[in-house]
């Protein structure tokens, strides 16, 4: 049963946990060039992959009835019957226990953020995802917790990293942007099958989601630009060359919008991300650019 359990952890979505590395990307050269720092963050990344995987299993157990009649989600291991609820619960408890024990051994801050992340998602699965607007805000908070956990992961070796409030806000809005896209695509997938929609989706319309997505996209770019333009005031190092990464962020946002408005198959945003080569390439280019610029100091 290893394969169904692994699939239930949704490894494709673990890419979200890469936000743990953001604080290190925007730190000083001496921190970026230390392999030890990257290894500790890799450990933190693995822990959050376990936590997020446990959350996905929990969500699939709770949504079992609706997933079974959903045109896409019916293929998930639990909904399709490949993984029994009993086995899923056992895997959930084991993975959660191991992840939290590992988090405790990194630092108090990291453990607190990891526990907070799980509690937030537990509340989301049980209640908050049924409340329109609150559901997408939870998504944004989850990304912020991941980012802050990157700072907590390095406290084990007494490294104190700081991160700009503007960057945190930009990350929050980017996550909300992705959540709105997901809502939009899910509505389109089930547009002729209203019975399949979650209750909160009835409060959303395509026009509303298109408008709010555009607004949030603009706010994401705005706060990232504010962060870059004020980098010398918000961190212990100055590098005005980071301004050249703004076009990459603009491209990523506009590419997402282009894809969803030309997606005839109405795929979920997570699937779109991994299928669009320009989007993947631009994300990699952004990371390489940040490392290259900051390492040149």
Please state what every model-predicted region is.
Residues 21-31, 37-55, 95-104, 155, ...:
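Signature of alpha-helical transmembrane segments in polytopic membrane proteins
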Residues 51-79, 134, 178-188, 254-255:
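Acidic (Asp/Glu-rich) catalytic motifs at the cytosolic membrane interface
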Residues 64, 69-114, 161, 165-176, ...:
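Multi-pass membrane catalytic core of lipid/isoprenoid biosynthesis enzymes
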Residues 16, 20-38, 128-165:
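Long, highly hydrophobic alpha-helical transmembrane signal-anchor segments
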Residues 2-6, 13, 126, 144, ...:
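C-terminal membrane-associated helical module and adjoining short loops/tails
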Residues 36-37, 108-114, 132-134, 163-167, ...:
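Short, aromatic-rich membrane-interface segments at the entry and exit
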Residues 18-22, 42-53, 90-101, 115, ...:
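Generic alpha-helical transmembrane segments of integral inner-membrane proteins
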Residues 1-68, 81-91:
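Topogenic membrane-insertion module of multi-pass membrane proteins
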């Amino acid at each position: 049963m290893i394969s169904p359990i692994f699939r239930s952890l949704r490894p494709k979505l673990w890419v979200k946990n890469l936000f743990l590395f953001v604080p290190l990307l925007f730190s000083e050269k001496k921190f970026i060039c230390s392999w030890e720092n990257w290894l500790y963050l890799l450990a933190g990344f693995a822990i959050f992959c376990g936590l997020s995987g446990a959350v996905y299993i929990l969500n699939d157990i709770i949504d079992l009835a609706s997933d079974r009649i959903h045109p896409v989600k019916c293929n998930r291991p639990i909904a399709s019957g490949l993984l029994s609820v009993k086995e899923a619960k056992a895997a959930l408890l084991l993975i959660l226990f191991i992840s939290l024990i590992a988090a405790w051994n990194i630092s108090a801050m990291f453990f607190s953020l990891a526990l907070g992340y799980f509690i937030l998602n537990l509340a989301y699965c049980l209640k908050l995802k049924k409340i329109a607007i609150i559901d997408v805000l939870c998504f944004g908070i989850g990304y912020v917790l991941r980012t802050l956990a990157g700072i907590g992961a390095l406290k084990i070796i007494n490294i104190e990293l700081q991160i700009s409030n503007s960057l945190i806000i930009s990350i929050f809005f980017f996550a909300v942007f992705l959540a709105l896209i997901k809502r939009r695509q899910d509505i389109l997938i089930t547009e002729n099958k209203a019975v399949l929609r979650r209750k909160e989706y009835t409060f959303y319309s395509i026009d509303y989601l298109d408008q709010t997505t555009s607004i949030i996209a603009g706010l994401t770019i705005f706060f990232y630009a504010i962060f870059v333009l004020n980098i010398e005031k918000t961190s212990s190092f100055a590098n005005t060359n980071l301004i050249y990464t703004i076009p990459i962020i603009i491209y990523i946002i506009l590419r997402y919008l282009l894809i969803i408005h030309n997606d005839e198959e109405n795929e979920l945003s997570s699937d779109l991300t991994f299928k669009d080569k320009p989007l993947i390439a631009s994300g990699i280019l952004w990371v390489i650019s940040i490392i290259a610029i900051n390492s040149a100091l």
